[in-house]
């Protein structure tokens, strides 16, 4: 069975809709800077409440999954490649800001997508 691009996209789109548990150590906002040739990952801390929702540790308010939120990041990581960014976050930063394997896998996938967009001169939108 040959999978075509549309089939692969449909698989990924379906998987993007699944429930995922949030990492209690926080989340990342990923973006690229084409001029600088860099991938950035801003790390934000959060607390997971009894409902499983991410809460801002400073305000105690639930962090919405959609829409603009004004928060101060804890750390910003930058790299020229997905691998360089992964080394900085997972190997050089102690303690590691990621505590869940599925979160680490997600970040690796997103960093590769960001790198491909950067190299191709395309826009990158985090999944």
From Swiss-Prot:
Organism: Nostoc sp. (strain PCC 7120 / SAG 25.82 / UTEX 2576)
InterPro entries documented for this protein: PterinBD-DUF4346 (IPR025595), UCP037673 (IPR017260)
Pfam family, one: PterinBD-DUF4346
Protein name: Ycf91-like protein
Family statement drawn from the similarity comment of this UniProt entry: Belongs to the ycf91 family.
